[in-house]
């Protein structure tokens, strides 16, 4: 993995500052709370502005992506003041279609990469997938980690993989899923 070398510190995994009883008590309190009036609307606006509208089917077509982009651009037409969604999320092969359809809007184009949805591929393939999405115009990359390596306790491998993908993103934002 070329470029800036990041060092994984495994000691962070040995420190667990979570107090289980406190988490459970707060969870119960949150489930009983009711948000009312303008606070509820502010919350809904905030949620909408953070959502990615997504089409990630094997049968995606440029027409389907264009349709989703049109929906995203005009979602707020009937309710003045409603924010747009944060992004449209597509496969790397559909990034340029979404980018063109969203031109002139503030809506970002996100792309899954790194062998979505399984993450079961070599680092070389994951980096190529990421670079393709960025080259096609993706503003954000949704990365799937090597879950098998993570569950096997190979955290340094996963850390290095994330660092390499981040480097391949260039200026695009990386989101690890």
Q: Model regions: which residues?
A:
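Hydrophobic, well-structured mid-protein blocks that either form specific transmembrane helices
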Residues: 125-177
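ATP-dependent carboxylate/acyl-activation modules
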Residues: 34, 56, 70, 139-140
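Hydrophobic faces of well-ordered beta-strands that scaffold small-molecule active sites
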Residues: 46-54, 86-90, 109-114, 141-143, ...
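Conserved alpha/beta-domain cores
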Residues: 57-75, 79-113, 120-121
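Alpha-helix-loop-beta-strand connector modules within alpha/beta enzyme cores
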Residues: 92-115, 153-175
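Conserved active-site and cofactor/substrate-binding residues in soluble primary-metabolism enzymes
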Residues: 18, 42, 59-67, 89, ...
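Active-site mouth loops of central-metabolism enzymes
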Residues: 30, 34, 50-62, 110-127, ...
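Charged, compositionally biased N-terminal leader segments and the immediate start
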Residues: 1-49
């Amino acid at each position: 993995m070329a470029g800036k070398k990041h060092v994984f510190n495994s000691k962070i995994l040995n420190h667990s500052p979570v107090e289980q009883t406190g988490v459970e008590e707060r969870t119960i309190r949150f489930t009983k709370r009711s948000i009312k009036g303008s606070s509820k609307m502010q919350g809904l606006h905030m949620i909408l502005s953070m959502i990615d509208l997504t089409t990630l089917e094997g049968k995606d077509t440029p027409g389907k992506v264009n349709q989703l982009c049109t929906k995203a651009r005009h979602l707020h037409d009937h309710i003045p003041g409603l924010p747009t969604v944060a992004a449209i999320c597509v496969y790397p092969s559909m990034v340029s279609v979404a980018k063109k359809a969203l031109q002139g809007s503030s809506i970002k184009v996100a792309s899954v990469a790194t062998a979505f949805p399984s993450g079961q591929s070599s680092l070389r393939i994951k980096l190529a997938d990421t670079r393709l999405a960025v080259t096609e115009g993706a503003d954000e990359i949704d990365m799937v980690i090597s879950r098998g390596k993570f569950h096997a306790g190979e955290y340094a491998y996963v850390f290095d993989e994330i660092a390499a993908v981040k480097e391949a993103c260039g200026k695009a934002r990386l989101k690890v899923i």
